Curated annotation (Swiss-Prot):
Name of the featured protein: Chaperonin GroEL
A GO cellular component annotation in the UniProt record: cell surface
Gene: groEL
Root EC class: isomerase
Organism listed in the record: Lactococcus lactis subsp. lactis (strain IL1403) (Streptococcus lactis)
UniProt xrefs under Pfam families: Cpn60_TCP1
Keywords: ATP-binding, Chaperone, Cytoplasm, Isomerase, Nucleotide-binding
Keyword Cell wall biogenesis/degradation: no
Quaternary structure (record): Forms a cylinder of 14 subunits composed of two heptameric rings stacked back-to-back. Interacts with the co-chaperonin GroES.
Matches recorded under NCBIfam families: GroEL (TIGR02348), PRK00013.1 (NF000592), PRK12849.1 (NF009487), PRK12850.1 (NF009488), PRK12851.1 (NF009489)
PANTHER family, alphabetized: 60 KDA HEAT SHOCK PROTEIN, MITOCHONDRIAL (PTHR45633)
GO BP term, pick one: protein refolding
List of residues binding ATP: T29, L30, G31, P32, D86, G87, T88, T89, T90, G413, N476, A477, A478, D492
Amino acid sequence: MSKDIKFSSDARTAMMRGIDILADTVKTTLGPKGRNVVLEKSYGSPLITNDGVTIAKEIELEDHFENMGAKLVSEVASKTNDIAGDGTTTATVLTQAIVREGLKNVTAGANPVGIRRGIELAAETAVASIKEMAIPVHDKSAIAQVATVSSRSEKVGEYISDAMERVGSDGVITIEESKGMQTELDVVEGMQFDRGYLSQYMVSNTEKMVAELDNPYILITDKKISNIQEILPLLEQILKTNRPLLIVADDVDGEALPTLVLNKIKGVFNVVAVKAPGFGDRRKAQLEDLAILTGGTVITEELGLDLKDATLEALGQAAKATVDKDHTTIVEGAGSADAISDRVAIIKAQIEKTTSDFDREKLQERLAKLAGGVAVVKVGAATETELKAMKLLIEDALNATRAAVEEGIVSGGGTALVNAIAALDKLSEEGDIQTGINIVRRALEEPVRQIAANAGYEGSVIIDKLRSEEVGTGFNAATGQWVNMIEEGIVDPAKVTRSALQNAASVAGLILTTEAVVANKPEPAAPAMPPMDPSMGMGGMM
């Protein structure tokens, strides 16, 4: 395929057009009075959302050069979403502001490499300032405030804070669609680990690509199962009970896996196999945790146990097990409360004794899975369109809340970014590096300008007043009042704010130092078939 190439200002200008199209679409959603965007779907009803990354992913432009610019900004939104789970619109606004001002200076003759260094230096300094401003989050009310600001809904804030209070900040919180119109919170005890099914033919729900097992037996072993004969006596016992089986093993391969899959497809036997979580000694400990939670025994040679001799008494049990391609969740294990509490006490003692931060983190994860649970937020709405929009809102709120617990909170509404400008005033560089710093200084004001504009206020007026206010005081765009943002509950997670700035500065610097852009030339449309000559007869017809 032949290529189309553009150089220097032509290339950057074409990409800037794409950046503007995407950013102008996304930034209308920013702030408490931001609007929604309607996305056409190839099937089903349109999606109405104000989620920046969802909108960015949908945008495809006809011009290849413009589309590359749009996709680079979409990458900023996606990266911010992956790291912090929220703040994608802020990241998009910051990227547009940095690139726009940077291109003006590059076009005027500035060195793009020097500007990029200045942008990176300013971003590092501002991020350090944001981290210093961060206030730790522990209590339920602060968690509710973060979720409320992210979702623009007090009810959603209550659901998220209740869920985190009941399962802990490290607990598992999932979001499902409710069959009714009311949104509800359901908390059940359970354990989740990062291993999915070994074959997609084991799924029972093809729409969600999930395997669901009700009241399953659970075979837990550290052995590799390659020969079906090893577990055949056990399978025959389970078959008589007409209950499903979840196999958690080192691996299932050889003839064993296709035999299990074939029986599953034929409807003879409902079975799902997953690999055991973790590695080495940590795997042994996690399998033991799972056995205690489900009331089973780890079948291992270390205890003198063999798969051929295993009976139903050695198997764990649970009310439900759900397995997707990446995760396994076991709900309401049949283990005794005393055994579980004893295990929890042992893990807590290990946490106190360990001197390794990594080991401590892994032990805390095990503790959360064993002592915590699974909280399910069941989202209800009047229509499918509203339901999809609500799910996206709650997912963003949940991610923002986790980010807040992890790194603390800062003043919301873009106030923290403007407050971070003071740290940039201490930087003194020369030439194009200083120009890059000034570009970031101006860009840090842009989220506040956009929030104000979306609420019907003049952004420049708000920024002028904000510069003279005390640190932490900001503009509440919902009410039009100047308030202490933290006291008013208008807060953003520090992780979200700094991730948005870091990712925006990174991609903006790359765009500014671009000197050539190579794109595929559009293929010429195939010529239409010429009309048939009416004088020509139809062969074989009278």
